[in-house]
Amino acid sequence: MKKIMFNDKYGLTQAVLEGRKTQTRRIADTAGRLRDITVRQALEEVNKGRACLFDEGRPLALSAYKLGETIAIAQKYADLAYEGEFFRLLGKVIFEKGCHNKMFVKADFMPHRIRITHIRVERLQDISEEDCIAEGVWRDDNVGLEGTTYWYHGLANSSFRTPQQAYASLIDRISGKGTWESNPYVFVYDFELID
């Protein structure tokens, strides 16, 4: 089983577990090789269920996850202590790297999973208002005369007028400054929590 990591600093793992985040974008590795880009579902049996970017008829980038695939949500072993799962793992985990770094956890030990329900490819800046909310951006209608504002966890005392502005700020903090401006192709995964 594969695992997937969501950013904890901006509360995205918790948003998935609470059902507020049901979509994620992952940058397609095209390494500047684009000429005549097309997008379609991969037809080969070995890649069935994956989205694929093609350039001049050759496969260029394949989605990491397949449609219908079940994926473990990576969490630090130490965080699982609060969910009662740590005791199940105690003798095995206490000295492992994954205790405080979820990059090193084993997928089979993770108590929460998602299932991929839809995959598509688009440019990062093509994200809709609804998709920004599905990505974990909060909508706040209680701001008095200013009207609706948008924000995300981990950014104190700041709000944005559109969900796209909030998401642009979030993706630049997660993936590096300039990510939004570079407008890369991304694999968009819709998912459901199944634990």
What is the predicted function of each stretch?
Residues 1-195:
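Secondary-structure transition motif
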